[in-house]
């Protein structure tokens, strides 16, 4: 909880330096060996990751979530919860992505879960990062569970319209999600147009970031934050190379202040 109340500023300061942030996503349901988590986290820190993001869609218990956060809080970067439902909240984290799945057909994922979660978040004092969550292309488990009307990869106009609507509703962060295990990322062209249209928004991109080249293309398109999760689980060495690639590129887009 070292960063509670300071996470948004932490993100802004890194962006102001002309750098893209990397978030390492840990899915508690896919962590089978808690003893190795500390070692993996150490290597991710050394490679340059900026935040540990903790979340998943299925099979998450409160005890396991808290145990993972207890291990990760030893490190000097923020811990942010990436919730799939109201059960994924913990006072051991610094902040929470307060998500609204804007392209869901189910009001529960647009505003219902948020109404239930808000008093809990207020009571435990988590820093809130208001985030529009848009599921694009592949969608994956999150798209299925969240009953998303998935936006096609190549429908850039629709992606931009959703992003602009989110910005007008006061959401600071726009998360463009291709889905866990996606065969491709959100198109760099879409990211570029979103960044040029929503100039004061922080654009988060996740899903399909499986190579250094893909990561580089996202950075050059203007992504503010890049999330990797599956590649960390499957191939630590490749994940480390991707992080180093992201952190090696100097951004040319305007930093968010």
Curated annotation (Swiss-Prot):
Residues annotated as binding Mg(2+) are 27, 57
Question: Which cell locations does it reside in?
Answer: Cytoplasm
Keyword set, alphabetical order = Cytoplasm, Lipid biosynthesis, Lipid metabolism, Magnesium, Metal-binding, Phospholipid biosynthesis, Phospholipid metabolism, Transferase
Q: Name one Pfam family in it.
A: PcrB
Molecular function GO terms recorded = magnesium ion binding; phosphoglycerol geranylgeranyltransferase activity
User: What does the protein in this record do?
Assistant: Prenyltransferase that catalyzes the transfer of the geranylgeranyl moiety of geranylgeranyl diphosphate (GGPP) to the C3 hydroxyl of sn-glycerol-1-phosphate (G1P). This reaction is the first ether-bond-formation step in the biosynthesis of archaeal membrane lipids.
Family per record = Belongs to the GGGP/HepGP synthase family. Group II subfamily.
Any idea what this protein is called? Geranylgeranylglyceryl phosphate synthase
Q: Recall the taxonomic lineage recorded for the source organism.
A: Archaea, Thermoproteota, Thermoprotei, Sulfolobales, Sulfolobaceae
